[in-house]
């Protein structure tokens, strides 16, 4: 199954992000439990985050991410989805 790297670029205020973050993290925990989300977390000192997904297609990742509470709440200004080919490590 292909692996995808997703970058979120946030445009929401820190206060709005903090308000939505608990339901966003609960949603991510559900994706982790089902095995589609492999890892996620914020980048340091920049309003971006990286998420690693397993899915059958880029379209499937995009459709899943459309249901992310951060996306629904308008926190994400840009979302970049790229197929990733991990050569080394636990996901290769």
PLM region spans:
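Conserved, structured core segments of small domains
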Residues: 1-92
């Amino acid at each position: 199954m292909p692996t995808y790297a997703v970058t979120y670029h946030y445009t929401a205020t820190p206060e709005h992000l903090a308000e939505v973050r608990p339901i966003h993290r609960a949603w991510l925990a559900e994706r982790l439990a089902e095995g589609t989300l492999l890892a996620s977390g914020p980048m340091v000192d920049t309003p971006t985050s990286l998420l690693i997904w397993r899915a059958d297609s880029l379209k499937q990742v995009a459709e899943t991410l459309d249901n992310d509470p951060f996306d629904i709440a308008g926190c994400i200004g840009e979302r970049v989805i790229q197929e990733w080919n991990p050569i080394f490590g636990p996901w290769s």
